[in-house]
Amino acid sequence: MKHPLETLTTAAGILLMAFLSCLLLPAPALGLALAQKLVTMFHLMDLSQLYTLLFCLWFLVLGAIEYFVLRFIWRRWFSLAD
């Protein structure tokens, strides 16, 4: 039986891993020409909006990947449940 708060802890774990990614992993750096092209394509006001969206997506994706990797490792080698 699953714990009733498992979905909440999953979301919290992803956000925690995203925070750790912000501290430990490099963020993508775009060239000026590509950044201007993306700003125009997505109808943004300036580069700061683009980088805000880019960093949020980047770190949430990395956090989700880290969470699932750590969960797999935990369940595979360290979990005591049968």
Swiss-Prot record:
It is found in: Cell membrane. It is a multi-pass membrane protein. It holds the Pfam family DUF1158. Keywords: Cell membrane, Membrane, Transmembrane, Transmembrane helix. One of its GO terms (cellular component) is plasma membrane. InterPro entries: DUF1158 (IPR010590). The chain crosses the membrane at residues 8-28, 50-70. This is Uncharacterized protein YbdJ. It comes from Escherichia coli (strain K12).
